Amino acid sequence: MRMVCLGLNHRTAPVEIRERFAVPSHKLREEGQRIRSLPGVDQCVVLSTCNRMEIYYWSNAPENAQEHILSHFLGDGRGELDMASYFYSHQGEDALGHLCRVLSGLDSMVLGETEIFGQVKTAYQTALDAGVTAACANKTFQKAFTIGKKVRTESQIHAGATSVGSVAVELAEQIFGDLSGTRVLILGAGEMSRVTGRALHARGAEGIYVANRSFDRAVELAGMIGGQAIRYDVWGNYLRDIDVVVAATAAPHCIITRETLLPLRASRKYRSLFLIDISVPRNISPDVADIDEVYLYDIDTLTQLADEAKRSRKQEVSRCEAIIRDSISRYFPDSALYDQ
């Protein structure tokens, strides 16, 4: 029985194609059962994230099964026949290696990201619960999880923040340590505010306030990140009690200056204040960094730190590939589970 991976991802298909084939999480079980019922498919696992949709299946007639799976997707109102060109197929050891690279974050849009490991685990557990796996799929995925974990523990592929939002969070943790109880003020309700706000909330920040000229947008963002919307004309009243400020408005001038902060120092008891300026033009005057307890990072500095982390991760790829090759030889001493 041969293991096959049939799918598309961020490298082979743009988002407007990927979204047509995406399988919502609440439909993964049903989709797995439908694919398992196709001719030639003996076992299967369906993985669907924002950046990929993949079918891992086992078959004694893999080419025949692949035709039926493609027909299922393309003939299900999701695409035309020429969309088959967006799909890739890996068989045998190549399919196993691909699964291990996916689990390790080597095949992710953000190299080394960790979320995919949990997403694959969820996909496998759903398939297991749906009764569409058997010995080959179960043993292969369990061993692949071990390999994926080994790559992460024996390499630095996941080290360092690679997005502006995650860099900002890491810097905040360097200043405050545990972010539990940290109070945050977000100025602006765009994409950068959302990403950074979510990252801070995920690390334990509490009392997140969102101010935007459009109060409706502030309410919307606050709802996404567990925060509270406040009117834009009163955000200055909150600075005395805030630990972190994320500035990302469209204002054409600085809205936080030395004159804004100096009168507040005593009432703040000279507590540390972390300012994240991710707006262009800048929202925070650079000279506020001269205030002893103020830490200011702008978009250029954050981007530079993220780029350095990306370069560092790329240098780890060959090491990770070697770990995967060696681990496949160790954990799969024969090819019975994926290529027989």
From Swiss-Prot:
InterPro entries in the record: 4pyrrol_synth_GluRdtase, 4pyrrol_synth_GluRdtase_N, GluRdtase_N_sf, NAD(P)-bd_dom_sf, Shikm_DH/Glu-tRNA_Rdtase
Active site, UniProt feature: 50
Keywords: NADP, Oxidoreductase, Porphyrin biosynthesis
Enzyme Commission number, as recorded: 1.2.1.70
CDD domains: NAD_bind_Glutamyl_tRNA_reduct
Enzyme class: oxidoreductase
Pathway annotation: Porphyrin-containing compound metabolism; protoporphyrin-IX biosynthesis; 5-aminolevulinate from L-glutamyl-tRNA(Glu): step 1/2
Binding residues for NADP(+): 188-193
One Gene Ontology term from the biological process aspect of the record: protoporphyrinogen IX biosynthetic process from glutamate
UniProt site (Important for activity): 98
Binding site for substrate: 49-52, 108, 113-115, 119
PANTHER family: GLUTAMYL-TRNA REDUCTASE (PTHR43013:SF1)
The family this protein is said to belong to: Belongs to the glutamyl-tRNA reductase family.
Protein's name in the database: Glutamyl-tRNA reductase
Organism of provenance: Akkermansia muciniphila (strain ATCC BAA-835 / DSM 22959 / JCM 33894 / BCRC 81048 / CCUG 64013 / CIP 107961 / Muc)
Gene name linked to the record: hemA
